[in-house]
Structure formats: C-alpha cells, structure tokens
Swiss-Prot record:
Protein family: Belongs to the aldehyde dehydrogenase family.
GO MF: 3-deoxyglucosone dehydrogenase activity; acetaldehyde dehydrogenase (NAD+) activity; aldehyde dehydrogenase (NAD+) activity; aminobutyraldehyde dehydrogenase (NAD+) activity; benzaldehyde dehydrogenase (NAD+) activity; retinal dehydrogenase activity
Binding site residues for NAD(+): 175-178, 201-204, 234-235, 254-255, 277-279, 357-361, 408-410
Residues of the site described as Transition state stabilizer: N178
Gene: ALDH1A1
Record's protein name: Aldehyde dehydrogenase 1A1
Keyword line: Cell projection, Cytoplasm, Lipid metabolism, NAD, Oxidoreductase
PANTHER family per the UniProt record, alphabetical: ALDEHYDE DEHYDROGENASE-RELATED (PTHR11699)
Recorded metabolic or biological pathway in which this protein acts: Cofactor metabolism; retinol metabolism
Record-linked Pfam families: Aldedh
Disulfide bridge partners, by residue number: none
GO cellular component, one term: axon
Gene Ontology BP annotations: cellular detoxification of aldehyde; fructosamine catabolic process; gamma-aminobutyric acid biosynthetic process; retinoid metabolic process; retinol metabolic process
The species this protein was found in: Gallus gallus
Length: 509
C-alpha cells in the first residue's frame, strides 16, 4: 500500500497500482434491456475511438427513440405494483447494491483500463480515484436502503397521520463523458437504493464502462428491467428520454445549454422531476496570508486534473496583489513539469482531451486569450503528432471581460487574475451565471467564514480543492443546475413524500 498527499493534509491509504490490462477485450457493445443484450431497432451502430491515438476501439449499437421506448416499457414493468422489485425488502436492495460493489471491486482493473482507453483518463486516476469513489458510493447507498422512511405527524383532530417516502418511478439518467463510470454510479446507486427503476444513456464518446456495468448488474441479481442501458446520441436517445411521457424523473450531468433543453422538454411534456448538474466557472481565491505552497498546488490540481475536463475546475483564480507574481511563477513552474502521453503508461501526468471537437474549442479559446491581451506564460498549443493533446497552458494578466475568464473552457488552461480587497473579489467571484463550486485559501478564520457565506456556489472549499465524498451533497446554484447528488440530500431527489391520514375514534398523546 502507498500513501498520497501532503504532510499537512495526508490522503487515505490507497491500494497499490497494478499494470493496466495489455489486451483489453470489449465484450459488451449492445443495448442492455431486461437483463438481455439487444441490437438497436434500427440496426445502426456508431464507432468509439481512443482519444490518445485516434484509433477505433469498436462499434456500439446506436439506440434512438424506439430503443428508449423499449427500455422504458421494461423499466415500467419492473416498477409495477407486485413486481419482484417493488415487493423486495429494502434490506435486500441494500444487499444487491453491496454485491454490485463487490463485483466492481473484483473487476476494478478491467474497468480502469477501459476508462483510460475509452475516455483518455490516466489509468492511475481511474484505478485509484474513480473506481475507489464508485465502490464507496455504491456501499454508501447500500447502507441507506433500509433507512429511508417517513414519520408520524401530530395532526390536529382525531386522526393518525404518517408520511411515506416512495420511489419516484422510472428515472431517465443521462451520463457525461468526462467521468463516465463515476457519474453512472452517482445516478444509479441512489435511484436503486430508493427503489426506482432506471433507463441510462451513457455519452456516445464513452459508452463502454456503462455497458460493462450492465453485465455486473445482471450478475449481482437485480431483477430484469430494473436497470436498462441505451447508448446513443443526445439529439435522438437523450431527447427521447427528456420528452418521454412515461419517465417520471430525469437526471442529467453535462452542459448548461443541454440542461436548458431538458428542463424545457420536461415542462412541455409530463413535468417530470429534473435534477441537473451543469457547467461551472469556479472562483478560487488566494489570499496573501495563505500557505502559498499548498495554495499553488491545490490551484494547479483544481484546474489541471483530468486535463481540465471537470465541471468544478477552479478556472478563475483570484490572487491577492502582494503574492501575485510569486504565485504566477510557481504556477508556470508546476505546469512545465508535466509529462504528456498515453494515459496507460506509468509516469504520464496528462492524457488527451476527449475528442476533436473539444480539442479545437480549447485551442480557439486559447487564441482568444492571446488576442484579448492576456499574457501567455507557457503552453498554448497542441502536443504530439497523434491524439487530442494540449500543452498545459497558463495565462496571467487576465481581466474579467476576456472570454477565457467568462466561458467554461473544459481544458488544461489556467487563468490567473489579481485582486486588492475582500469586497472587490467577492463581487467579481459572484459575477457569473454559474455557481457550482468555489474555494478560498487563507489562515484567517473570519475571512474563511465570510467567503463561505458570501460565495454563490453549491460547494465552497476552504484551504483545499476538489474534496469529494459520497456523504457530501453536490450541486449548483444559478445556471450550474438544480437539485443535489450524493449524501442524504441526493437520496431525497429519488423519493416522493406521501401523506397518509386515517380517521380514528380518539387520539391520545
């Protein structure tokens, strides 16, 4: 076993890192409905590519509206009153989830290798962090399965009143490409814990780990129709979920632009419940009294983790004037140390962007930063001859009106801005349509508490960044989304509260 982390903030002990599988065989490329594998109704398939070398991995069945209809029918049948799933003890649902966690742990190496090949994620990150988080999240939800219950209510009059926390029903779940397996688990685990059935659409760029999970869900013993997985494209399969009249809830992680379309579709159809985890442009505020070593390192990781492809990336770094130049110097030095390459190889610290579209978007935003007057300190262009690699890029002298300071870049591009006063930086930090996360680095508890309450964000970190746990709710303010995932709050998103009142002859206290 080995430890990772700084002396002042050590990370938990992590398992030893094995070598990735050298010859990964892709077994599951069809649509998963009713615990069975199906070709798409149309017979269409789409290609899946490795972003590190642009080579085709395989072809996957392309689901569309007809396949979503099939999956919803299966999920609805599994949710019927009297079905094996609806009559199952809550503790048994928890046992099945724990069994699923055991299987994920057993196949951790396969899934981590798949995430690296399919999504360009560093194998070390996938194995140690992503798979570790998946297993913990499943077990956390498993533990809650028989602890979700209502209350008795002291209603006036001769009545006995209680509440029931019932599953919402059939849940459509649309998964992003940046954390395909983690987001799959974030969505299915609480839904199943509460007794719902699900129809999942993984991102077309990264469908492989979700399909592999279908095999584990069947092996764990979940009844047919409880989990259905339909790979496909947003405008077809995703839109079919959003507009479906027999889906009771949709949960989506992705761009704010698509989130708006999903909420609009819900409003135009059956007013299905909607949980949205959308974009961000998160402020990270560094005061002169902060521990500069830790602040610079957390700011670096908070931006460059997974090639900057994180919704919570600390992409607006505000540094107090007295330490600005030194902070910029350290940031440049840190970025220049990166080793880019095949995410399966040991020693590689940055992999590729997910696809050509994202690659070009990031390069265009870098060019806009140059044209608008930001100082390019390092990086600024593509890397290598093959794959969608971009050099770690640092800009200084960034102003709030520049595109790179306003738009979500979703790439390895760090923007460093200067501030003088507390009131000024609070206003600037909140001057955005987003509100997903924020951080402040200071040794002054009064400053920390001031910012914890003043910053308009669903998560505020103090003297750390990207600290996540299955117990902690996560979600956005403003246009970064609605609702919460993880923690007890996340479970509440998957239940409906019903009030039951019974007339009785006499009520006694």
């Amino acid at each position: 076993m080995k430890k990772q982390g700084s002396p002042s903030n050590p990370a938990p002990v992590l398992p030893a890192l094995p070598e990735p599988l050298k010859d990964l065989k892709i077994k599951y490329t069809k649509i998963f409905i009713n615990n069975e594998w199906h070709d798409s109704v149309s017979g269409k398939k789409f290609e899946v590519f490795n972003p590190a070398n642009e080579e085709k991995i395989c072809e996957v069945a392309e689901g569309d509206k007809a396949d979503i209809d099939k999956a919803v029918k299966a999920a609805r049948k599994a949710f019927e009153l009297g079905s094996p799933w609806r009559t199952m003890d809550a503790s048994e649902r928890g046992r099945l989830l724990n069994k699923l966690a055991d299987l994920v742990e057993r196949d951790r190496l396969t899934l981590a290798t798949m995430e690296a090949i399919d999504g360009g994620k560093l194998f070390s990150t996938a194995y140690l962090m992503d798979l570790g988080a998946c297993i913990k999240t499943i077990r956390y939800c498993a533990g809650w399965a028989d602890k979700i219950h209502g209350r008795t209510v002291p209603m006036d009059g001769n009545f006995f009143t209680f509440t029931r926390h019932e599953p919402v029903g059939v849940c459509g779940q649309i998964i992003p490409w940046n954390f395909p397996l983690v987001m799959f688990i974030w969505k299915i685990a609480p839904a199943l814990c509460c007794g719902n059935t699900v129809v999942v659409k993984p991102a077309e760029q990264t469908p492989l780990s979700a399909l592999y999970m279908g095999s584990l869900i069947k092996e764990a013993g979940f009844p047919p129709g409880v989990v259905n997985i339909v790979p496909g494209f947003g405008p077809t399969a995703g839109a079919a979920i959003s507009h479906h009249m027999d889906i009771d809830k949709v949960s989506f992680t992705g761009s704010t632009e698509v989130g708006k379309l999903i909420k609009e579709a819900a409003g135009k159809t059956n007013l299905k419940r909607v949980t949205l985890e959308l974009g961000g442009k998160s402020p990270n505020i560094i005061f002169a009294d902060a521990d500069l070593d830790e602040a610079a390192e957390f700011a670096h990781i908070g931006l460059f983790y997974h090639q900057g492809q994180c919704c919570i990336a600390g992409s607006r770094i505000f540094v107090e004037e007295p330490i600005y130049d030194e902070f910029v110097r350290r940031s440049i030095e840190r970025a220049k140390k990166y080793t880019l390459g095949d995410p399966l190889l040991p020693g590689v610290q940055q992999g590729p962007q997910i696809d050509k579209e994202q690659f070009q978007k990031i390069l265009d935003l870098i060019e806009s930063g140059k044209k608008e007057g930001a100082k390019l300190e390092c990086g600024g262009g593509p890397w290598g001859n093959k794959g969608y690699f971009i050099q770690p890029t640092v800009f200084s002298n960034v102003t709030d009106d520049m595109r790179i300071a306003k738009e979500e870049i979703f790439g390895p591009v760090q923007q460093i801005m200067k501030f003088k006063t507390i009131d000024e930086v609070i206003k600037r930090a909140n001057n955005t349509t987003y509100g997903l996360a924020a951080a402040v680095f200071t040794k002054d508890i009064d400053k920390a508490l001031t910012f914890a309450s003043a910053l308009q964000a669903g998560t505020v970190w103090v003297n750390c960044y990207s600290a996540f746990s299955a117990q902690c709710p996560f979600g956005g303010f403003k246009m970064s989304g609605n609702g919460r995932e993880l923690g007890e709050y996340g479970l509440q998103e998957y239940t409906e509260v019903k009030t039951v009142t019974i007339k009785i002859p006499q009520k006694n206290s």
